[in-house]
């Protein structure tokens, strides 16, 4: 069985480019770990940074896998109606949303869990996990932010249903909120992240549901 994945990481994103690279690399590491522990899974992972994807070619890139179920991760800036790469809205409520039919979309991006997520689900995305408001990344602790964000993928790859994996993500934020080694403002930002986490679509989805022959 094969797991098809697409990672969109805006390494040129203002203020968060380095975090997006860290998220991309950590996602790749988790996929490699999954490949080692699950002998029945072949990983087919495509990674696109700011210089490889734009509004015009995104559908062509994703069309390679979107006839079947797949995982797609977005790391960059967002709004209620768009996801941005290199200053360009590459996914919006009127453009390119349709290419994510059959996808579990996982994002670390602001506000994509609002109207854009609804449009994705209406266009047959399997599920969406992201943020209805800000996805904060406190300055100077990108490693902490990345670790929290990856807790969702780690749990999902371990076989947990989507709903439980999202609970683990919220628990990771909760741990940060009560971590006295962090500055008060950092803890408040992570609290906002926790409160903004949203799951839309099929909450019973598991990693096995994304596998294709």
What is the meaning of each model-derived region?
Residues 12-15, 55, 77-81, 110-115, ...:
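Solvent-exposed loop/turn segments at secondary-structure junctions
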Residues 15-21, 83-86, 139-144:
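Short, flexible/disordered intra-domain loops and linkers
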Residues 27-31, 59-63, 90-97, 117-121:
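Short amphipathic alpha-helical segments and helix-helix/interface helices
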Residues 68-69, 102, 125:
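Local beta-strand N-terminus motif with an aromatic residue
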Residues 103-109:
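ADP-ribose/adenylate-binding Rossmann-like module
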Residues 113-213:
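Active-site-proximal C-terminal subdomain of hydrolase catalytic domains
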């Amino acid at each position: 069985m094969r797991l098809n994945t697409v990672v969109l990481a805006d390494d040129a994103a203002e203020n968060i480019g380095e975090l997006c690279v860290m998220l991309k690399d950590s996602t790749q590491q988790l996929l490699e770990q999954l490949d080692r522990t699950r002998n029945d899974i072949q990983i087919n992972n495509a990674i696109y940074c700011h210089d490889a994807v734009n509004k015009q070619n995104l559908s062509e890139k994703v069309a390679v896998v979107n006839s079947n179920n797949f995982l797609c991760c977005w790391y960059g800036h967002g709004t209620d109606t768009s996801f941005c790469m290199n200053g360009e809205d590459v996914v919006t409520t009127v453009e390119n949303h349709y290419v994510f039919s059959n996808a579990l979309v996982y994002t670390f991006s602001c506000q994509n869990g609002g109207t854009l997520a609804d449009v994705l689900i209406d266009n047959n995305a399997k599920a969406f996990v992201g943020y209805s408001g800000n996805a904060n990344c406190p300055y100077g602790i990108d490693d902490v932010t990345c670790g929290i964000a990856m807790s969702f993928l780690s749990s999902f790859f371990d076989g947990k249903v989507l709903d439980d994996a999202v609970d683990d993500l919220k628990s990771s934020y909760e741990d940060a909120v009560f971590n006295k080694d962090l500055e008060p403002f950092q803890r408040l930002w992570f609290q906002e992240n926790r409160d903004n986490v949203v799951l839309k679509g099929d909450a019973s989805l598991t990693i096995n549901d994304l596998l294709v022959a």
